[in-house]
Amino acid sequence: MSSPDDFETAPAEYVDALDPSMVVVDSGSAAVTAPSDSAAEVKANQNEENTGATAAETSEKVDQTEVEKKDDDDTTEVGVTTTTPSIADTAATANIASTSGASVTEPTTDDTAADEKKEQVSGPPLSNMKFYLNRDADAHDSLNDIDQLARLIRANGGEVLDSKPRESKENVFIVSPYNHTNLPTVTPTYIKACCQSNSLLNMENYLVPYDNFREVVDSRLQEESHSNGVDNSNSNSDNKDSIRPKTEIISTNTNGATEDSTSEKVMVDAEQQARLQEQAQLLRQHVSSTASITSGGHNDLVQIEQPQKDTSNNNNSNVNDEDNDLLTQDNNPQTADEGNASFQAQRSMISRGALPSHNKASFTDEEDEFILDVVRKNPTRRTTHTLYDEISHYVPNHTGNSIRHRFRVYLSKRLEYVYEVDKFGKLVRDDDGNLIKTKVLPPSIKRKFSADEDYTLAIAVKKQFYRDLFQIDPDTGRSLITDEDTPTAIARRNMTMDPNHVPGSEPNFAAYRTQSRRGPIAREFFKHFAEEHAAHTENAWRDRFRKFLLAYGIDDYISYYEAEKAQNREPEPMKNLTNRPKRPGVPTPGNYNSAAKRARNYSSQRNVQPTANAASANAAAAAAAAASNSYAIPENELLDEDTMNFISSLKNDLSNISNSLPFEYPHEIAEAIRSDFSNEDIYDNIDPDTISFPPKIATTDLFLPLFFHFGSTRQFMDKLHEVISGDYEPSQAEKLVQDLCDETGIRKNFSTSILTCLSGDLMVFPRYFLNMFKDNVNPPPNVPGIWTHDDDESLKSNDQEQIRKLVKKHGTGRMEMRKRFFEKDLL
């Protein structure tokens, strides 16, 4: 746990009460100090009192003083009944003999306790502990934090779990700033604190509550209180006629007390007692002022609301107070001994359960000022999550996320100033040792991208593409090909270099345009780029390239930036490029692309847009009915022998296509293909409205029932255009196939075979279906860009006459791409 010194702040009420001298002792009764040499006798007499007269311990301190005076008058030696916490801590465990004169033994336990503590510290602090790290994007500041936590856990004897536990287990915890699993969860700060102190710390202040935490705690505490109340009633009925001064009870029940005390004694050491006092202090600060107390005599004690029960046997209200008090005001050692085990087990739950729930607690002025003070002294961490997680340990009524939201939405306007820090985030002081205030915010750990950074990234990517394509250094113009190249470098060069490139014919770097080139680009590029431009991490630069630069266009942003600079205007960084376009229609929860939900909305869609003819309406309605009945299509029709043979005959699978960059073309080939495509309008200008829907060739071995939900061929083609125009990377062939299946109802094996026929050219994808539906032939013959089995055989034969026919049909660019498919064994 981070100490207040880390923040150089923290009001006194947020400081852990680790020193017994800091514990607030109620001033209702003066503490009586016993001589140090009679500590064992004091402890023994207290144990006798508590065992022989359980019902009488709730009498007020004034009655205890009167008892002591009466005992003095009767010359009866009685131990002190009220001790300070320090006396209770130092009192040794005593074995009490009978009143006939047996000696009192006082074993020394200081050495034993010290040995136990040494044994605990000697081993790794996280030994036998297992942790599962929450790797959600909002759980940590960066992936480096997760890796650091994993290394710390393993280095200190702990184990990192690969999968989230399904149920609560001993010594198994989840590490996360929030708890949405209802499993034992600790904050990342707990791991760091244990490793820093080289000991296993008490995790009660690091536990993260579940959403329904208050309800669970209250129910468990009420059950415990109810059971205590039943025992109390029985005790009261047995002793209702025996309530008298404590000295009489001790004298008449000494034998029973001796038997019980000799068998059950637990030493309360100083640290445990201090922690008890700390919890009592926290509970007193945050308990509701409306807490009900049955006796009304101890208004400053924390109470647990109990269910109604029969109190006919309770003749004395003070007797009923005993079991209702969560922490007794006089801190009686015997009571602490008897309830120590159960209290320690549920102490963290009690301390948090008695507080207001997190989603309802309001921030006080003191808490707001405390948060502002911490942020002012840690200005570079103001946008992180870990800072507010650490603050939550000093503001126990709120979680780290709620504190972060509080600062960002409300308190950031009141920040006004921060304290100066150096480049490492450490506070800077003046000559007098005072902190230096400033209104200039230092750059935070998480920074936004600037236009200069976007331009630098675009130029670097363009240079990398230039090197890969022509093997020429864009800065010096020298060739990168040498006789000393390793086989690995040669193989990599062959994958990226333009095979049709003639050395010396390449354009200069200023005239070169990336066009639609999207990759490939190795991770090493971003690693080296992040080392040269340390303002952002490697992953941040890579995401900036993938999600922003590719979407904007490399050439487009370079042109925009240079044009703005030429006009003496300040260019803007790339933004608003990651917002997903809104889908048409009313979204439904869950998988709203499923066929079953589309079928439920089918009737309303049909009313809005009528179908072209009655036949298509009947077919679509039948498909919708089939979908609503979990695809009640005969199994032999869905998985017939021909379909299975078709699937097994495919030599290429999704992984091969994914690894072969099916959508990526070298620059020269791409230009040739685009040139041919622009002269083939006759194959694309087919009016979809002239094609009846569903077409005769559309069978269930090629399409899912979802396909038949479309009202017309135009609707299907519009959806197809929407899917293939998405932002797909060269390695995302499998994602494209899955999206086609989910959005248009094209079976995965069918779309995979189409990609093979098209050599991965998505521009020809709509052409394939238009000609297939129009001519009722699959695949469509004599269509440029669609390779049939006969075309492939002609290409493999190397017959010059056949090659000339293929060039005339498909063009030279597609010929080169098809050859690459053969070379990579994708056909």
From Swiss-Prot:
Keywords: Activator, Chromosome, DNA-binding, Nucleus, Phosphoprotein, Repressor, Telomere, Transcription, Transcription regulation. Transmembrane segments: none annotated. GO terms for biological process: establishment of protein localization to chromatin; establishment of protein localization to telomere; G-quadruplex DNA formation; negative regulation of transcription by RNA polymerase II; positive regulation of ribosomal protein gene transcription by RNA polymerase II; positive regulation of transcription by RNA polymerase II; protection from non-homologous end joining at telomere; regulation of glycolytic process. GO terms for cellular component: chromosome, telomeric region; cytosol; nuclear chromosome; nucleus; protein-DNA complex; shelterin complex; transcription regulator complex. Pfam families: BRCT_2 (PF16589), Myb_DNA-binding (PF00249), Rap1-DNA-bind (PF09197), Rap1_C (PF11626). The modification Phosphothreonine is found at residue 486. GO terms for molecular function: cis-regulatory region sequence-specific DNA binding; DNA binding, bending; DNA-binding transcription factor activity; DNA-binding transcription factor activity, RNA polymerase II-specific; double-stranded telomeric DNA binding; G-quadruplex DNA binding; histone binding; nucleosomal DNA binding. This is DNA-binding protein RAP1. It comes from Saccharomyces cerevisiae (strain ATCC 204508 / S288c) (Baker's yeast).
